[in-house]
Amino acid sequence: MKFKTALRYRVIYQVRSLAIYFGFYALFGILFPLIGLLFSNDVNTVSSDAVIPCLVFMGILSFLGVNTDFKLFIQNGLSRWTIFLVNFVSNAILSLVGSLAVLVLIKVFSGNFISHFQLSMKLIDVYAQGNFFMSWLLFFILLMLSGSLGLLAGVFNDRIDGVKKLIVLLLLLMIPILLGTIAQLGGAPMRLRMLHILQTMVGYQSTGFTVLPLLLTISCFVGINLGLAYLLNKHREIKIGRAHV
């Protein structure tokens, strides 16, 4: 199996999954609210978020695909580096297509197509200010972040076993406690410094939010997640019961 064949297989699987997702979202995120409006006397506008569910879907899809695809690709002669590239490129393609599809869907419902109902993307609108291409770029990067987290979590879950996995998870859980302790012990200057770092990372200024710092921050996290996933995937083995192949 070559790279193009593996990528085509992966993209077809993901696009089909995306179509299923949109079917469920149309039912629960669009149809149900519309039915509620028909039987309601309330004239307020009903808003359905289109960003968070898509981010969750992307992470879950990436997580689930790691194990099944790895076994299939290894058995068909692909190297671990090629498998990593297939996952990265397919996630990028799905993020690009998925973000565009959601934005088009939002545009359809943003006018007077259906009164008192709209699809929202408040998190993105804070930064993009209605700019379509900036919204597309930011949504794409957010989906890449979710996909990279799912990829890293999937590889970690398959690569690390037993006590090691528990220790790593506990260390991750301790990070907020550690940061909170540092902020308290450091006093007001430390808290202000940490707040300033956070504001810089998310692009908050006195005039409002700017998108470039946030894009850089998310891109860095995507790079870190992908780097860790590659390192974990480098010596990964196929597990059959308790045996390793």
For the regions a protein language model found, what residue spans apply to each?
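Hydrophobic alpha-helical transmembrane segments of multi-pass membrane transport/permease proteins
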Residues: 16-37, 50-61, 167-180
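Helix-loop-helix units of permease transmembrane domains in multi-pass membrane transporters
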Residues: 7, 66-92
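Membrane-interface helix-boundary motifs at transmembrane edges
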Residues: 74, 78-82, 154-164
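Hydrophobic cores of alpha-helical transmembrane segments in multi-pass inner/ER membrane proteins
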Residues: 56-68, 98, 142-149, 217-228
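Secretory targeting signals
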Residues: 32-54, 90-160
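Terminal transmembrane helical anchor/hairpin motif
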Residues: 36, 104-138, 159-242
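Aromatic- and glycine-rich beta-strand/loop motifs that create alpha-glucan
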Residues: 1-19
